[in-house]
Amino acid sequence: MVSLQQLTISILLLFTASVQSLDINVDDKDSICSAAKYVVQGIWNYYEGLKYGGTVGMFAPPNYWWNAGEAFGGLVDFYTYCQSDNSTLEKLIYNGMYHQAGENYNYIPSNQSMTEGNDDQGVWGMAIMEAVERNFTEPESHSWLEMVQAVFNTMNARWDADNCGGGLRWQIFTWNSGYDYKNSISNGCLFHLAARLARYTGNSSVYVDTAEKVWKWMEDVGFLTEEDNGDVRIYDGAKITNNCSSVTDLRWSYTYGVFMAGCAYLYNFTGDDVWLTRTNEIVQASLSYFFANKIMQETTCQPQNKCNNDQRSFRCLFSRCLGLTTQLAPETKDRIREVLEASAEGAAKSCSGGSDGVTCGENWAIDKWDGVYGLGEQTSALEVMMALIVEPPLSVKTGGTNRTDYSAGTNSEDNANKNELTITGKDKAGAGVLTAIVLAVILGGAIWMIF
């Protein structure tokens, strides 16, 4: 068995070359992988799993558990397309993802009950789905597919028909602030996973029905609307007070991404032009709002330099979803590819900061590092590069593994909104304060964006 020290040395030896900036040829896979290698080095700099006393699968604060899910999804793609012969990298990714699966293998580890929401579980589900669709090294006990099915089943079981006519709440646990808030990203993750599982397994009865249920609810509640110009607008969410009628008017790239790619998966699987139309509408809305001069930006906060740590990572999932959409709905490829190329070139030029000379920044439009750094900057840069070389995801029909369990997760208590864990009053109070801060940032965002 490889020791922690050996793993650390091996991974560091991957990146011994000295580089002061990243050059990238967007038409050359080797060039993209070469640049991405240094971005991945920056990701590992934040990793706690190689540090003495650190937690396997987690990244340094202020990054949350869900940020780790973002990172590992991109690392699976980097391994698959750029370094599939690197056994050290393979073990690091495998150990990190498997270690965070939780006691019931549904990505609800009890030690994350103070912060984990439905969206967090969903993001990890998306990461594990990357492993499924890339035939990444399988665990012996529970397959990646079984674990994604457990994520889907536990999320779907929390569908709350008693408030706002349906939908998922933001939070899983009743003691977390934000439990009274329903948001688009949580429901988007459920929609997205349903679409991917439908295509992968070939089973339409449960998964397509769930995707259609989520889409209809999003329209009915007013979280997803069509504007006069035909573009789709996806709002952040609303408190359940007054039937979710007071909608928070904030738009985030990753929310658009999960719905966009979900529609593309459904179109690819069903052949129904309704899903192609919806894909095209979200693509057009995304191109209109989240790009300036073809360069990707988190428009709701970035131009004002107001993005928080979470928001600075949203383009990670957005980029991944754009890449997947080009493969599943080829009709969108030319439009998306153009902006991905420009954004990847800008991201590479931003990766020219820090003491290593390749630390990535937030602003991809200025041809240099902007002084901003963090895990989100690294994962976003990685994903926009990987989106250029992504290949069609596997399914059971095209060579994917089929260790499936359609009932996975249904026998645990984690599918309930009220989870009976032994939590102290002090822990609940701390969780409430922590989540309240995040909710305040979301709901208060519209105020500072005016100025």
Curated annotation (Swiss-Prot):
In the induction comment, the record states:
Induced by caspofungin. Expression is also regulated by SPF1.
- Lipid attachment in record (GPI-anchor amidated alanine): A429
Q: Provide the topology term for how it sits in the membrane.
A: Lipid-anchor; GPI-anchor
Q: Which residues form the propeptide?
A: 430-451
Top-rank taxon of the source lineage equals Eukaryota
Sorted keywords for this record are: Cell membrane, Cell wall, Cell wall biogenesis/degradation, Glycoprotein, Glycosidase, GPI-anchor, Hydrolase, Lipoprotein, Membrane, Secreted, Signal
Q: Which family does the UniProt entry place this protein in?
A: Belongs to the glycosyl hydrolase 76 family.
- Tell me the protein's name: Mannan endo-1,6-alpha-mannosidase DFG5
Q: Which organism is it from?
A: Candida albicans (strain SC5314 / ATCC MYA-2876)
- Organism placement in taxonomy: Eukaryota, Fungi, Dikarya, Ascomycota, Saccharomycotina
